[in-house]
Amino acid sequence: MKNKKRVLIASSLSCAILLLSAATTQANSAHKDSQDQNKKEHVDKSQQKDKRNVTNKDKNSTAPDDIGKNGKITKRTETVYDEKTNILQNLQFDFIDDPTYDKNVLLVKKQGSIHSNLKFESHKEEKNSNWLKYPSEYHVDFQVKRNRKTEILDQLPKNKISTAKVDSTFSYSSGGKFDSTKGIGRTSSNSYSKTISYNQQNYDTIASGKNNNWHVHWSVIANDLKYGGEVKNRNDELLFYRNTRIATVENPELSFASKYRYPALVRSGFNPEFLTYLSNEKSNEKTQFEVTYTRNQDILKNRPGIHYAPPILEKNKDGQRLIVTYEVDWKNKTVKVVDKYSDDNKPYKEG
């Protein structure tokens, strides 16, 4: 009987200890949960405060792409590559929302690449059988298609530029005001700026004298070409000439100076950066633009072997072009490609 009592007392004590332990654990857990909740509420409040600060900061400051207090920039990009001509068009469309101006505003930056397509060819049927085709001219053409409500108001570059590097900045200020300067940099904290910068060693950029409010054209034309220790004008028949005694019809490249010496625009190609500033009457919802990139090629013809014959130069003998039509939706600020075609044997000819 005594043993039974002892067992009951021990059992009761065990239960009491277990209950006390469980209560302590629950209390500790509740206390920890309370601490975690307080910590979470503190973090949430801190995050909300930071978010409010960021939001207020965004509302009260002018971002780099803003125009004044309520202006806004919407950017679109379209890229078209044509394998046949090895020409790439990359166009940036910057829509400017300016509540102080009664027209739509658009900046179009024409970029991409026009590969040189430098070629050495053999033509056995001719006396001067070794040919070099090189890019003597690059052309970029931009026109508004049959829409008098959209006008070109400015362009970069302007006139003729002969420096090895071209840098210019276009600036737009609220109210439709615009300006352009040489070099790179912003003119005002309340203006939106766009820069162009490209290399054209041994070439000149010429803006066509026939440009108007619906059509602009730029030509990048070879001038005095430097290669190795030589400097020869584009009009010189001896340009890139090499002693042809070691050359054969099978190796036309040996009739000309080593191509690694050629200027970059001859050897590799041209990367244009041209800018057009346009305005559009708000009653007009859509406008189409036609953009053409063209490569003109001169052909230099030399006769291989020991029998000398004067070199032959044929200017603008060949050419390839890529023509793309883009459509701008002014209301939705979108751009799409609606047509594209390319062709060979189409060198650009002004007129």
UniProtKB/Swiss-Prot annotation:
<dbReference type="InterPro" id="IPR003963">
    <property type="entry name" value="Bi-component_toxin_staph"/>
</dbReference>
<dbReference type="GO" id="GO:0005576">
    <property type="term" value="C:extracellular region"/>
</dbReference>
<dbReference type="GO" id="GO:0051715">
    <property type="term" value="P:cytolysis in another organism"/>
</dbReference>
<protein>
    <recommendedName>
        <fullName>Uncharacterized leukocidin-like protein 2</fullName>
    </recommendedName>
</protein>
<dbReference type="Pfam" id="PF07968">
    <property type="entry name" value="Leukocidin"/>
</dbReference>
<keyword id="KW-0732">Signal</keyword>
<dbReference type="InterPro" id="IPR036435">
    <property type="entry name" value="Leukocidin/porin_MspA_sf"/>
</dbReference>
<feature type="region of interest" description="Disordered">
    <location>
        <begin position="27"/>
        <end position="71"/>
    </location>
</feature>
<feature type="compositionally biased region" description="Basic and acidic residues">
    <location>
        <begin position="30"/>
        <end position="60"/>
    </location>
</feature>
<dbReference type="InterPro" id="IPR016183">
    <property type="entry name" value="Leukocidin/Hemolysin_toxin"/>
</dbReference>
<feature type="signal peptide">
    <location>
        <begin position="1"/>
        <end position="27"/>
    </location>
</feature>
<comment type="similarity">
    <text>Belongs to the aerolysin family.</text>
</comment>
